[in-house]
Amino acid sequence: MNLNEVISNIAHTLEGKKLIDSNKTLKPNDDVNKSQSSNDSFPTAMHIAAFKLVKENVIPALESFHKTLIAKEKEFEKDVKIGRTHLMDATPLTLGQEFSGYASQIKHGLKSLRNSIDHLSELAIGGTAVGTGLNTSPNWDTTVAKYIADETHK
């Protein structure tokens, strides 16, 4: 668990000590790894990161993009062009209709992203190696989940 060693070493240097010092205050396995496993902490960290990115950045950007496409749909509702399919000319349509198709795709993508938020809110923390919670303190999972919820405003 290299990450535990990295975290321990960072804490050690933040205390003003050198990495070559053998007496480390924060031990990689006894302190950093306490009550968790890479099988629950990494998926939990990934869910938190994805949750924040999707909710705070991706969804707002796509909502703005969707509004722009709707505006373009109206702006070009009377501009007729040739539709294309299979690299060939097809039937006429308006440029507004084409933008409508793009807007529809973004709308469906937004719906899928919003649905994913609930799934990303499910955390593996506290499950340890095989999901049993073995070697964790009582209520570890709920305590950590509450802290994460408070920090992420979820």
PLM ranges: what are they?
Residues M1-K154:
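Conserved, well-structured ligand/cofactor-binding cores
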